[in-house]
């Protein structure tokens, strides 16, 4: 019968001794510093009752290294550690310039779980059996991020493409468009755009097309009407001011706010190309710096440049950079107190009218033709100077009688003019009116048709309709209107509110924008005279000429 060998089941612990590079141990702290640091300072006669700064400890170690002659004869940047330094740093050699960084883990205030292996020398170390047991990992709870990505330089760099990189991407036409869409490029600002404060601006690529008759590509970008040639792109870094300008345009609604998921997916697609392009540029730059340091005799800078170039040319370092996963910074979760529903802005008077029988007034062609046909804005046949959501009722939002709004509703040839009641004491804004306003009751003989059931609705006799005392029969142009119709004054739209949408030449709906922005672009002749816009909450079919809207501004 053969021998039987019992094998212990694996439990996640190592069963044999081997050499490997280990992370630094978690230190035992005595007061403000680790036990190793405190003992080292005690051996030099230092008082550790109060915390000694890292700068002072680093200076003390530098003097100790010079005094003991611990610099490596073949490489003056390396230190051959003696017994004291081995106990302190846990390795036989260190870089002289890394002493300050190596001391960070020895301070209790800096204790964390981040990996600090890159500060240590690449040499195998013998570790004890207790270190070979698999360590339990604790879950680190990260700060929650918002849905949208922050518009900061670190995020924009992940999607920023220089001119030289775009030219490299052109060598693969099959993937060129997919990599360009959604990325950011830097172009010169339009000299005729007086709203642009900086000579260059960051724009997002929204489309790619071939130039007619050639194989060259043209880019369609935001905030720029014309197509952009690749030859005019910038090959330099963007500035912080340009990034802030991009952020402001996104806040104004000129660009779509990117989400974290969208930006992460796009950054992963571009990471490999960006890293290879950066490595080539950096190595070429170091070559020029090395030549310059040789000419000037800068020995210290020359040594640093040579080390950095050697590191970047190392295949392992290049592979590590390519494996890095770009991380997107999320927008801070800050509640915006200004965001509210449209119902919150509805006045009490408008709410009262929307619930009254006046909301059932019948549509008539006379109302459509009374004020100039196409030049006026209508909602189902009723005159509207500022569209609202209540069908059949028009909020002219006029400023009759010192800022009191007036609503006009039409039924056939009759018009009901409703004014907000004056205060009981007859004083508005601290002023006494010169003449008391006229008050009249609605005549019950005026029929008002109900659209729902066809029956005539008689106004409530108790309702009081206040007529403005300064209404005249003549309008501003000297033309006489129907005496039954009250004078309608149109209040300008809110110029700063983001209320307006339009359709661009590519067929995409853009907006919302404010009238201030639209007027600036119209003055710069970006739009034709037949350019149409419409308000949020309405359909594209209700679009009106921008020139007509701007007349009311």
UniProtKB/Swiss-Prot annotation:
Q: Which Pfam families match?
A: GYF (PF02213), Plus-3 (PF03126), SWIB (PF02201)
Q: Which Gene3D superfamilies match?
A: 3.30.1490.40, Plus-3 domain, SWIB/MDM2 domain
Residue span, SWIB/MDM2 domain: 26-109
Which portions of the chain have biased composition (kind: Polar residues)? 447-461
Span of domain GYF:
497-551
* Plus3 domain residues: 150-275
Which residue windows does the record flag with biased composition (Acidic residues)? 466-480
Q: Which CDD domains match?
A: SWIB-MDM2 (cd00855)
Q: List compositional bias (Basic and acidic residues) regions by residue number.
A: 343-353
Q: Superkingdom of the source? A: Eukaryota
Region annotated Disordered sits at 335-357, 447-482
What GO molecular function terms would the record report? DNA binding
From the Swiss-Prot or TrEMBL record, give the protein name: Uncharacterized protein At5g08430
Natural source organism? Arabidopsis thaliana (Mouse-ear cress)
């Amino acid at each position: 019968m053969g021998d039987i060998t019992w094998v212990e089941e694996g439990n996640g612990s190592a069963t044999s001794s081997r050499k490997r590079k280990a992370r630094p141990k978690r230190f035992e702290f005595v007061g403000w510093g680790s036990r190793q640091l405190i003992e080292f300072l005690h051996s030099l006669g230092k008082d550790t009752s109060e915390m000694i700064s890292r700068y002072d400890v680093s200076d003390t170690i530098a003097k100790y290294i010079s005094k003991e002659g611990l610099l490596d004869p073949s490489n003056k940047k390396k230190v051959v550690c003696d017994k004291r330094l081995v106990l302190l740093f846990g390795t036989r050699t260190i870089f002289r310039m890394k002493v300050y960084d190596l001391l960070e883990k020895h301070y209790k205030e800096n204790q964390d779980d981040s990996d600090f292996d890159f500060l240590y020398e690449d040499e195998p170390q013998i570790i004890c059996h207790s270190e070979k047991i698999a360590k339990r990992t604790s879950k680190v709870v990260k700060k929650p991020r918002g849905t949208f990505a922050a518009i900061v330089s670190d995020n924009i760099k992940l999607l920023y493409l220089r001119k030289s990189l775009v030219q490299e991407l052109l060598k693969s036409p099959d993937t060129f468009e997919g990599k360009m869409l959604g990325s950011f490029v830097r172009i010169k600002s339009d000299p005729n755009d007086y709203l642009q404060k900086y000579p260059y601006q960051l724009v997002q690529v929204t489309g790619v097309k071939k130039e007619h008759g050639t194989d060259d590509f043209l880019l369609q970008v935001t905030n720029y009407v014309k197509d952009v040639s690749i030859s005019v792109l910038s090959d330099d870094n963007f500035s912080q001011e340009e990034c802030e300008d991009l952020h402001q345009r996104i806040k104004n609604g000129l660009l779509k706010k990117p989400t974290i998921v969208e930006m992460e997916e796009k950054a992963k697609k571009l990471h490999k190309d960006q890293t290879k392009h950066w490595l080539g540029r950096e190595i070429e730059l170091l070559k020029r710096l090395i030549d310059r340091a040789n000419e000037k005799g800068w020995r210290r800078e020359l040594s640093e440049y040579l080390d950095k170039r050697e590191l970047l040319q190392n295949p392992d370092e290049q592979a590590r950079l390519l494996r890095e996963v770009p991380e997107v910074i999320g927008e801070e979760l800050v509640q915006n107190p200004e965001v509210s529903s449209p119902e919150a802005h509805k006045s009490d008077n408008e709410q009262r009218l929307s619930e009254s029988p006046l909301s059932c007034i019948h549509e008539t062609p006379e109302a459509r033709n009374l004020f100039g046909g196409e030049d006026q804005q209508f909602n189902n046949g009723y005159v509207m100077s500022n569209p609202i959501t209540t069908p059949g009722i028009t909020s002219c939002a006029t400023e009759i009688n010192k800022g009191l709004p007036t609503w006009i509703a039409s039924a056939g040839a009759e018009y009901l003019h409703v004014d907000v009641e004056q205060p009981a004491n007859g004083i508005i804004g601290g002023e006494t009116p010169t003449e008391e306003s006229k008050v009249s009751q609605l005549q019950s003989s005026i029929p008002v048709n109900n659209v729902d059931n066809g029956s005539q609705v008689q106004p409530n006799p108790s309702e009081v309709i206040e007529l403005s005392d300064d209404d005249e029969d003549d309008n501003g142009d000297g033309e006489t209107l129907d005496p039954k119709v009250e004078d309608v004054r149109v209040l300008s739209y809110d110029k700063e509110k983001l209320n307006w949408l339009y359709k661009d030449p590519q067929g995409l709906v853009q907006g919302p924008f404010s009238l201030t922005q639209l007027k600036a672009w119209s003055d710069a002749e970006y739009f034709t005279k037949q350019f149409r816009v419409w308000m949020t909450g309405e359909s594209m079919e209700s679009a009106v000429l921008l020139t007509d809207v701007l007349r009311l501004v």
